[in-house]
């Protein structure tokens, strides 16, 4: 068993499930216990870092873009480990300055995401990170913001992909996930 496989098993055991959250009929996969455990959090970042270095060794990653809310929790640590910049993708009204925005549907309501337009220079290479890929709407919206400023998405990276929801079908770049469910 590789180190990454061993780490994945440990990470999986830390997830907590909440039924009927945030809406009835949904099962919420909570990865916050991973963040609360420094050893496990280091293993999470190490797993992503190792994957990205192996896959994009010669191709420069310029930025990690973290999606609100949980991509903002581990994205900066991953960016720091890789020695690249970090860009937050936030809900409307959370970022100062000129922002690109996109409206999208999430579960049973519309949301608006924003990203500062000067945060990612034209022609940059970006990896988008978030905790869970479900239907793909949130990740698609984040990718659209990145494309609006003329940057390239190398990959979407998730801690967990809910395979039965086929969210990867909406995305325009490859995905990587530590766990699948």
Swiss-Prot record:
Record GO biological process: adenine salvage; AMP salvage; purine ribonucleoside salvage
Pathway: Purine metabolism; AMP biosynthesis via salvage pathway; AMP from adenine: step 1/1
Cytoplasm as UniProt keyword: yes
Subcellular location as annotated: Cytoplasm
Modified residues (N-acetylserine): 2
Known EC number: 2.4.2.7
Molecular function GO labels: adenine binding; adenine phosphoribosyltransferase activity; AMP binding
Keyword Glycosyltransferase: yes
SUPFAM superfamilies: PRTase-like (SSF53271)
GO cellular component, as recorded: cytoplasm
Database matches in Pfam families: Pribosyltran
UniProt catalytic activity: AMP + diphosphate = 5-phospho-alpha-D-ribose 1-diphosphate + adenine
Keyword line: Acetylation, Cytoplasm, Glycosyltransferase, Purine salvage, Transferase
Superkingdom of origin organism: Eukaryota
PANTHER family: ADENINE PHOSPHORIBOSYLTRANSFERASE
Miscellaneous: Present with 937 molecules/cell in log phase SD medium.
Protein family according to the UniProt entry: Belongs to the purine/pyrimidine phosphoribosyltransferase family.
Function in brief: Catalyzes a salvage reaction resulting in the formation of AMP, that is energically less costly than de novo synthesis. May lack catalytic activity.
Annotated protein name in UniProt: Adenine phosphoribosyltransferase 2
